[in-house]
Amino acid sequence: MPQLDTSTWFTTILATITTLFILFQLKISKYIYPSSPELKSMKSLKHNTPWETKWTKIYSPLSLPLQ
């Protein structure tokens, strides 16, 4: 069984890591990064919600009445 012959493992692993390193470098170098990101407005927009506020309140377990 050739898998049990450990004499070629180092060469195989080294070749695999080198190939992956080169491929990732080529893939990353082709990516175009935005040169100047646009500033976004920090104003918070008011959303019109169709539900009532009383049904959307989040209750903390410690603030609930004891039963």
From Swiss-Prot:
Subunit record text: Component of the ATP synthase complex composed at least of ATP5F1A/subunit alpha, ATP5F1B/subunit beta, ATP5MC1/subunit c (homooctomer), MT-ATP6/subunit a, MT-ATP8/subunit 8, ATP5ME/subunit e, ATP5MF/subunit f, ATP5MG/subunit g, ATP5MK/subunit k, ATP5MJ/subunit j, ATP5F1C/subunit gamma, ATP5F1D/subunit delta, ATP5F1E/subunit epsilon, ATP5PF/subunit F6, ATP5PB/subunit b, ATP5PD/subunit d, ATP5PO/subunit OSCP.
Against Pfam families, the record matches this protein to: ATP-synt_8
Provide any one GO MF term from the record. proton transmembrane transporter activity
N6-acetyllysine, modified sites: 54, 57
TM segment ranges: 8-24
Instruction: State any GO CC term.
Output: proton-transporting ATP synthase complex
User: Which superkingdom?
Assistant: Eukaryota
What is the membrane topology here? Single-pass membrane protein
- Positions bearing N6-succinyllysine: 54
- InterPro entries given in the database record: ATP8_mammal (IPR039017), ATP8_metazoa (IPR001421)
* Keywords for this protein: Acetylation, ATP synthesis, CF(0), Hydrogen ion transport, Ion transport, Membrane, Mitochondrion, Transmembrane, Transmembrane helix, Transport
What is the primary gene name for this protein?
MT-ATP8
Q: Which residues belong to the signal peptide in this entry?
A: none
Protein name, per record: ATP synthase F(0) complex subunit 8
Q: Matching PANTHER family, A to Z? A: ATP SYNTHASE PROTEIN 8 (PTHR13722:SF0)
Protein's GO biological process = proton motive force-driven ATP synthesis
What protein family does this chain belong to?
Belongs to the ATPase protein 8 family.
Where in the cell does this protein reside?
Mitochondrion membrane
Role summary = Subunit 8, of the mitochondrial membrane ATP synthase complex (F(1)F(0) ATP synthase or Complex V) that produces ATP from ADP in the presence of a proton gradient across the membrane which is generated by electron transport complexes of the respiratory chain. ATP synthase complex consist of a soluble F(1) head domain - the catalytic core - and a membrane F(1) domain - the membrane proton channel. These two domains are linked by a central stalk rotating inside the F(1) region and a stationary peripheral stalk.
